């Protein structure tokens, strides 16, 4: 079997395609959450604690010297990424919780009783006929 054919079979399996769709949607969701944190949540939060822009929080490890740029540790961006992570983790937690609840609800619903087979119907008719033929007391 050629390697291309093997790869095609691997790539077209349901789990791989589902995973690819999940990664793409997850990346798009990550961008939305990043925008939510940086554009919606952090500005009012910064305003509440004195007009602080978290993106600007940094620690200069070494000043710029000539054409060599400064070495800066941007911990404000790290704080924002922590907020991103917490929101994404919470959203995923809620989605999984909802999926589990729906799955449990489906499992809890009793299955419809199976319809009687032709043999069972015939046996029931024979039973009913025998009951009718018995003398009543």
UniProtKB/Swiss-Prot annotation:
Pfam families: MscL. It is a multi-pass membrane protein. One of its GO terms (cellular component) is plasma membrane. The keyword Iron does not apply. NCBIfam families: mscL, PRK00567.1-1, PRK00567.1-4. Belongs to the MscL family. This is Large-conductance mechanosensitive channel. The lineage of its organism: Bacteria, Pseudomonadati, Pseudomonadota, Gammaproteobacteria, Enterobacterales. The gene is mscL.
